[in-house]
Amino acid sequence: MLASLAGLFFVGMVLTTPGEKVHSLFFQLWYLFDVGAERNIPSWYASMLWAAFAGSAFAAAVLACRKRVSWAAMGLVGVAASIDEHSELHERLDQIGTPLAEALGWDLWFTWVIPGVVIAVVVAALLLPLVLSLRPRSRWLVLAGGAVFLLGAIVVESLSGLVLAHFADQVTWHFILVTLVEELLEMLGLALAIAGVLAMFDVSRLPERAWTVRFRDSTGPAEVAGE
């Protein structure tokens, strides 16, 4: 939906004459919904998705019978990523990535992906035992979500940098299209991961009680963990 609106407003901007009020209006609307920009509606939405992921992981840490520390760690990852979406912290990794890229002889536009990959590998290694211990449906949803997210955040992001470099740092429709794909993959991957975590919960209403929340731990039948 957000990507469709951004594309619609971009087309309107292209079809109008620069300097006209309607062109300026389309530009402002495009930037407001541009999934590649920061501190706008899509970035807020992505930040809220990470917050939802963190909240579900923290809830699991409270209700789970085992691996509570790992669930809490997953929640902290979600909090950090939510802050990053709002504050663009990952782009500051260029200070580390640029000298590394020069030393390795790699021609990258977004050099932050080098330390970003290292961080992603470390986080994945720490959380993999937890993910592998989940029930099959949740396990595959989280694994698929992580793979789709990294495909967008690392691979397609690097591709968008190559597009920028090819067009001498000019924002063209090629770059906008690649960025749309990147952000869509990131949001889709995150949504899959959230669905995987939430699939571990069972919320039911009993006649004698309002609501009962059960956390489907990886071993044994679901236990009543909270109400």
Where are these regions (language model features)?
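Hydrophobic alpha-helical segments at protein termini of multi-pass membrane proteins
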Residues: 1-227
